[in-house]
């Protein structure tokens, strides 16, 4: 009994000593923290606010970038072409996502040799909303059109993300390569707004399979757009890891050496037209064209006079040459329409 009491007394004294030592250590540790906060409290508070805002932006970037449900019912109803032969296609990506595509074939003269345009749309709506534009391309350019709904858009499964959209574009190109009725030597990529970033990425990774790219009213990158849209906040100082979606087109364009057409609407109120000019200047292509439309807005540049003429001339120029890289002696060409 006495031994038990002595053991308990020893444990009790040891616990009291440990608690006393821990409290002393805490006081020593708290002192520099209190002094630091007293001297630099304002800076620490600003840093905490900055980190909080960055965290919120990271979490909600998808909400700010992707609008698959605008206009309403875009996820429920996808308009289809009427009176025109077309194929409503579903394919699978490498990660198992089911995508919806619409293929509209040109059926006129020399149709087996017609170029095929893979059409990547912007960040809202679905492929059905692009049919008026696509049908005019069909008539004026005499091409096949393959319209793509990204994951999370229209009848495609999944949720949109940067890496997801890249996987989608790769799956679409792989599918085109399996079609015996499409000329593999005349594959053009077209991308508007967000679709331009997708097209640039796909071209940068598949230069041997792509004949040319055409991008319209697209951006340098998401960080560049954030600095433009949120100019009241020092977004330019945020490191890249703060961005969930980056779409670094200004870097990837350096890998796009195929013929390139940059279409810029100078009345674009969403993406600064200067970004299109900068992408054009960054392009290493020996055959690059910049078509400028002073009255062109972000979504409606295709309605400007001379729009389809510019695309037609570019496509004919690419198709006419057996070696696209030797197509022109001049390094660039700017057209103001």
From Swiss-Prot:
The chain crosses the membrane at residues 37-57. Keywords: Glycoprotein, Hydrolase, Membrane, Signal-anchor, Transmembrane, Transmembrane helix. One of its GO terms (molecular function) is palmitoyl-(protein) hydrolase activity. Glycans are attached at residue 299. Its EC number is 3.-.-.-. GO terms for cellular component: dendrite cytoplasm; membrane. The active site is at 193 (charge relay system), 268 (charge relay system), 298 (charge relay system). InterPro entries: AB_hydrolase_1, AB_hydrolase_fold. Belongs to the serine esterase family. This is Protein ABHD13. The lineage of its organism: Eukaryota, Metazoa, Chordata, Craniata, Vertebrata. The gene is ABHD13.
């Amino acid at each position: 009994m006495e031994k038990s009491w002595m053991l308990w007394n020893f444990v009790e004294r040891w616990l009291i000593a440990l608690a006393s030592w821990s409290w002393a250590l805490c006081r020593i540790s708290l002192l520099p923290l209190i002094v630091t906060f007293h001297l630099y409290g304002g800076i620490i508070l600003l840093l905490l606010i900055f980190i909080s805002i960055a965290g919120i932006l990271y979490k909600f970037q998808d909400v700010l970038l992707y609008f698959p449900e605008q206009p309403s019912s875009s996820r429920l109803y996808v308009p289809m072409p009427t009176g025109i032969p077309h194929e409503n296609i579903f394919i699978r990506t490498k990660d198992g996502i089911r995508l919806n595509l619409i293929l509209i074939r040109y059926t006129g003269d020399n149709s087996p040799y017609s170029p095929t345009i893979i059409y990547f749309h912007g960040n809202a709506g679905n492929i059905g909303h692009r049919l008026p534009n696509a049908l005019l391309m069909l008539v004026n350019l005499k091409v096949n059109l393959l319209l793509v709904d990204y994951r999370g858009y229209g009848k495609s499964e999944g949720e949109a993300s940067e890496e997801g959209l890249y996987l989608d574009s790769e799956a679409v190109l792989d599918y085109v390569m399996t079609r015996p009725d499409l000329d593999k030597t005349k594959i053009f990529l077209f991308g508007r707004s967000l679709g331009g970033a997708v097209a640039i990425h796909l071209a940068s990774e598949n230069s041997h399979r792509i004949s040319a790219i055409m991008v319209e009213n697209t951006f340098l990158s998401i960080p560049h757009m954030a600095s433009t849209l949120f100019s009241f906040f020092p977004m330019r100082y945020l490191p890249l890891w703060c961005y969930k979606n980056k779409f670094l087109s200004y870097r990837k364009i350096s890998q796009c050496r195929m013929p390139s057409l940059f279409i810029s609407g100078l009345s674009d109120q969403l993406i600064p037209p200067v970004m299109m000019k900068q992408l054009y200047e960054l392009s290493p292509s020996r055959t690059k064209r910049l078509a400028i439309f002073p009255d062109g807005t972000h979504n409606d540049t295709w309605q400007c006079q001379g729009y389809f003429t510019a695309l037609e001339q570019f496509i004919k120029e690419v198709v006419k040459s057996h070696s696209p890289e030797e197509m022109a002696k001049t390094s660039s060409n700017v057209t103001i329409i």
